[in-house]
Regions:
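N-terminal cap/lid segment of alpha/beta-hydrolase-fold proteins
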Residues: 1-23
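Catalytic nucleophile-loop/oxyanion-hole region of alpha/beta-hydrolase
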Residues: 39-42, 68-101
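Conserved alpha/beta-hydrolase
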Residues: 49-73
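Alpha/beta-hydrolase-fold enzymes
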Residues: 110-193, 322-336
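Short beta-strand/loop motif that positions the catalytic acidic residue
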Residues: 214, 220-222, 226
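Short alpha-helix in the alpha/beta-hydrolase fold that links the catalytic acid
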Residues: 216, 230-239
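Catalytic active-site module of serine/aspartate enzymes centered on a nucleophile-bearing elbow/loop
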Residues: 249-301
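Class I SAM-dependent methyltransferase Rossmann-like catalytic core
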Residues: 329-403
C-alpha cells in the first residue's frame, strides 16, 4: 500500500508529522508504531516495515517534536515530559483516527526513541500488546570528563543552549548505504538542546531504577559494540523489568544503529518471532491488585517505613530536616499549617494552591516562598491545571456528541 504523510495534534496544539502505511492485506486491526533515534526522523525508520514483512499490520512512524518535518527548534522540545506526552497523544490519535486499539499495537523504538517509549511505558502504563527496544540511550557516552556536570552548570548560567553530536555515521553502522544516507540527509539535525540531553539522563535514571513498574511484554536488543551508549543501564533495566514476558538479545559486533546494521537480519529474525508470538496469544497483563501486600511495591514501602538510626548520615540528615521544618514553622505560614494539620491535609493543599507566600516577618515570607516552590508542590499545582484541562476536554467532547455533562468530585 502507498505510504501517506499526515499530521496529528498534541495536547498543546502542536501538529506533528507522521507517516502511515496501511496494511498490505487491507486489514485494519493491528499496527506497528515506529520511533526513531535522536537527530533523525520517520523516513529513516519506515524501512523496518519492509524488513519485517508483515502484510497484516498497518505501520506508523512519527517525526518527534523538533525533528524531520515536525515543528519546533531543531533538536529541542519544551521538556522530556512533553515528548513523552507526545508519544501518548500519538497512540491515542491512532486509536481514534484508525480504530486500532492499544492492545493491538506493537511499538518498536530505537536509541532516544526507546528512552521516550520506556518512560511512556513507566509513566502511562499503556495496555499495548508488546514493545521492542533497540539500544535504548539510557546513558550516552560523553567522552569529555565531567561533561554532564559542566553542562548542568552552564545551563544554570546560560539557560537552554545547544550542543552538536560528535557521532559520525561510521560509528553508527557498518552498512555503507546507511552511512551515506545519514551523511546526505538534510532532515538530520546534529544539534540537541541541553535541556533535552540532561532531561534524557534524568528520565533514563528514573526509569531504569524503577523498571519493575513496567509490565508490558518486552524485547530488548543490545548492540554488542556500541560506541554511543553504555551497556550497563540497559542490562539493569532488563534485570529489573516487571514484565512476565521479556527477552534480551545481545548482538555481537553491532554498532548503535541496531536496526540499520549490516547484519540486521539477525535482529529482525528475533523481532518477527517475538511479535508473532505476542499476537498469536491473548493479551497478557500482570496482576498488580495485590502489589501493596507483596512484591516490589511492598518492599519499597517497608524500606521507606524503616526507622533510620540517628547516628547514620541519612538518619542525621532527616532528623535535621524535621527539626528545620519545626523551627521554620515559627515564621513561615505554610510550615505552620503543615505542622499543625499535617502536610497531607486539606488545609495544606488549599494553601499550596493559593501559592501566596506569607510569614510573620520578611524572613518568614522568604522561607515560605522557598517552601511553596518545592518541586512536590509545583507538581501538585500542575496536577490541578492538568485536571482542569482534562475536565474541559471531556466536557467539550460530550457537548459535541450532544450528551449531558456531569462532574463528580470524589474527595
Amino acid at each position: 500500500m502507498q505510504e501517506q504523510q499526515k499530521h496529528f495534534a498534541t495536547q498543546d496544539g502542536t501538529e506533528l508529522f507522521y507517516r502511515y502505511r496501511p496494511a498490505a492485506d487491507g486489514s485494519t486491526e493491528k499496527a506497528i508504531v515506529l520511533f526513531h533515534r535522536g537527530h533523525e526522523h520517520s523516513g529513516r525508520m519506515m524501512f523496518v516495515a519492509d524488513e519485517l514483512g508483515f502484510d497484516d499490520f498497518a505501520y506508523f512512524a512519527w517525526d518527534a517534536r523538533g525533528h524531520g518535518h515536525s515543528p519546533g527548534e531543531r533538536g529541542d522540545s519544551p521538556s522530556i515530559g512533553t515528548s513523552v506526552a507526545d508519544v501518548d497523544d500519538f497512540i491515542r490519535h491512532i486509536q481514534s483516527e484508525y480504530g486500532i486499539k492499544p492492545e493491538n499495537i506493537c511499538v518498536i523504538a530505537q536509541s532516544v526513541g526507546a528512552v521516550l517509549v520506556s518512560t511512556w511505558l513507566h509513566d502511562y502504563a499503556p495496555k499495548i500488546r508488546c514493545a521492542v527496544l533497540a539500544s535504548p540511550a539510557f546513558k550516552v557516552k560523553l567522552y569529555v570528563p565531567f561533561a554532564r556536570t559542566g553542562l548542568k552548570i552552564m545551563q544554570k548560567w546560560r539557560g537552554n543552549f545547544f550542543v552538536n553530536s560528535y557521532v559520525k555515521s561510521h560509528y553508527l553502522t557498518h552498512n555503507k548505504e546507511r552511512q551515506d544516507s545519514f551523511n546526505q540527509d538534510p532532515l538530520i539535525t546534529r544539534a540537541i538542546s541541553v535541556r533535552i540531553l540532561l532531561g534524557l539522563y534524568e528520565a533514563a535514571e528514573r526509569v531504569v531504577s524503577d523498571a519493575q513498574a513496567i509490565t508490558t511484554p518486552l524485547q530488548l536488543l543490545i548492540s554488542g559494540s556500541d560506541w554511543v551508549v553504555h551497556h550497563k543501564p540497559q542490562h539493569d533495566f532488563y534485570n529489573r523489568l516487571g514484565s512476565h514476558i521479556k527477552e534480551r538479545h545481545i548482538l555481537p559486533g553491532f554498532y548503535h544503529d541496531t536496526l540499520g546494521e549490516q547484519n540486521r537480519e539477525i535482529a529482525f529474525v528475533e523481532m518477527r518471532r517475538f511479535i508473532r508470538e505476542r499476537f498469536n496469544q491473548p493479551l497478557q497483563q500482570v496482576d498488580l491488585t495485590q502489589a501493596h501486600l507483596f512484591g516490589d511495591s511492598r518492599r519499597e514501602a517497608d524500606e521507606l517505613a524503616t526507622p533510620l538510626p540517628v547516628c547514620t548520615p541519612r538518619g542525621a540528615f532527616w532528623a535535621t530536616y524535621r527539626a528545620s521544618l519545626k523551627l521554620g514553622s515559627r515564621w513561615s505560614e505554610g510550615l505552620r499549617i503543615g505542622q499543625e494539620t499535617g502536610f497531607d491535609s486539606g488545609s495544606t493543599l488549599d494553601y499550596v494552591y493559593r501559592n501566596q507566600p506569607q510569614g510573620s516577618n520578611a524572613f518568614g515570607v522568604w522561607v515560605d516562598k522557598y517552601y511553596l516552590n518545592a518541586i512536590g508542590w509545583r507538581g501538585i499545582r500542575q496536577r490541578k491545571v492538568n485536571i482542569g484541562k482534562a475536565i474541559q476536554t471531556a466536557s467539550a467532547k460530550l457537548r459535541e456528541a450532544g450528551k449531558p455533562v456531569h462532574v463528580l468530585d470524589i474527595a
